[in-house]
Regions:
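HAD-like aspartate-dependent phosphatase fold
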Residues: 1-138
Length: 138
């Protein structure tokens, strides 16, 4: 894009979400992600016990469910996320981008995945990514 920047100067929505969570739930808390490996890595590096919802243990409730783009979204993923949210997990979205451009066309974005989870759970998430204030607070 023509802007001079180092990697340390770039803050993506996954990193911003992990930073925001540090101020809202205790370190080491179980956090389940509906998202790609990069999201799980950011959550782990922030000090949480993070894993994809498909790897969630059968018992207990996560402290938070974090939802972003998940190109392997399944019905079971939605069902597990819904269960944890309905049983008290904090519901956080990395962003609500409905689409993103790729290979000359638009593809469903993280916001489409967030909308599916929100509809299933009947709960709206805390949104961290642009243009929400959580991005600046992170």
């Amino acid at each position: 894009m023509g802007f001079p920047a180092t990697p340390e100067q770039v803050l993506g929505s996954a990193a911003a979400t992990a930073a925001w969570l540090r101020g809202h739930i205790p370190a080491g808390s179980p956090v389940l992600a509906v998202g790609e490996p990069g999201l799980i890595q950011e959550l782990s590096q922030a000090g949480f016990h993070a894993m994809h919802v498909r790897d969630a243990p059968e018992d207990g409730v996560a402290a938070a469910i974090v939802v972003g783009l998940d190109r392997s979204l399944t019905y079971d993923t939605l069902a597990v996320a819904q269960h944890h949210i309905l049983h008290g997990a904090l519901f956080v979205a990395t962003n609500t981008d409905a689409t993103f451009p790729a290979e000359g066309r638009l593809l469903p974005g993280g916001g489409a995945v967030v909308a599916a989870v929100a509809t299933a759970a009947g709960v709206e998430p805390v949104v961290i990514g642009k243009p929400e204030p959580g991005m600046a607070e992170a």
